[in-house]
Amino acid sequence: MSQSISAQSGYTLPVFACASAIAAVETLLTSNCPDSVTLELLEPARTAEIAIEQGALLGHHRALAITRSEPGNNLDLTRHTPVWAEVEFTPGEGKLIIQGGEGIGKQLDREGQAAIYSYAQRLLRHHLQPYISGDQTLMVSLILPLGRTLATRTSNAAFGVVEGLSLLGTSGIAQPLSAPEQLAEFQQHLTSAAQQHQCLVFCLGENGLDLARQWGVPLDQMVKTANWLGSLFVAAAAVGVQEILLLGYHGKLIKLAGGIFHTHHHLADGRLEILTAQAVQAGLPYPLVQELGQAPTTEAGLKLLRHWQTEQNCPWVSKIYQAMADTVDRRSEEYVYKVSQHQLKVGSLLFDGDRQPVAISTQGQAMADKLGMTIPET
């Protein structure tokens, strides 16, 4: 059976992983692999029918099923990649154990724990727990045979995920992050959120959304922005938003400190140049500034600053990144006023590749307090 996917969007990897797992369990219980499975996405509250490519028994207590990722009309490197789930029932106490197999990334900051994040975990538990009786344990191993290869074409390593892809996302619907035709959809979401709140949180990508939720931002105050920060700043001011808290990866938000308001690297970069300029202003010794400028990435530059901070007992990270966060605020407010003559207060919260906060601006802290956020110490 075909999958019910709109012309504009498909489904995220967690949906296909869950569908494979459901099909594998059904194969194990009935000795027949279904042609498709229908599952609840939870986010949003709708169902999806996912085609099952194949499935097979691997013994009396084990089975395997396979789907293929279909992200819709997105420029997504996971298109058509196989998603396997192997399941096994063992004696137990009604538990569900979810494991990452080959091609599922490992989180360096969590001792190699599989990069299967909260939405994927929730989706799997919602659909698989009903199959488990009180004297059983269900073991589910998720496998992306091409995951290790595909991961070399992503920025996963910058976020501390190695050897494969993440099952990341806050929704079952896959939306392109950088396709221009999606800007109108983001603006529509922004307009809807602005009708309820004068303070919103702009979240860059899925990591920003996931952390916003973890740190206590109400769902109806989150707006996903992708790379169109400039356009969405102006749109927010035009519909009456008073305050925006930016929540994003430092390697993206650093561009705003340099006056770059479309953050896709194909259009503009300059990240290391901006970082070194901030370092000079903070008083970093010139030989270290030169070394910083040779870092391959901003994440590597941040690690150098942390090393020198420990070595010299000087708070280089907070000095440089606090000033940078405040500069992001100022340049953003100036941009909005220059383009639209509207006043908009901006705060910023930058996180690193380990998804930990690096710096929060003065205005950002005030907004976070107002929102009731609980943020780990920087």
From Swiss-Prot:
The keyword Iron does not apply. SUPFAM superfamilies: CbiD-like. Keywords: Cobalamin biosynthesis, Methyltransferase, S-adenosyl-L-methionine, Transferase. Its EC number is 2.1.1.195. GO terms for molecular function: cobalt-precorrin-5B C1-methyltransferase activity. Pathway: Cofactor biosynthesis; adenosylcobalamin biosynthesis; cob(II)yrinate a,c-diamide from sirohydrochlorin (anaerobic route): step 6/10. It comes from the Bacteria. It catalyses: Co-precorrin-5B + S-adenosyl-L-methionine = Co-precorrin-6A + S-adenosyl-L-homocysteine. Gene3D superfamilies: CbiD-like. One of its GO terms (biological process) is methylation. PANTHER family: COBALT-PRECORRIN-5B C(1)-METHYLTRANSFERASE. This is Cobalt-precorrin-5B C(1)-methyltransferase. It comes from Synechocystis sp. (strain ATCC 27184 / PCC 6803 / Kazusa).
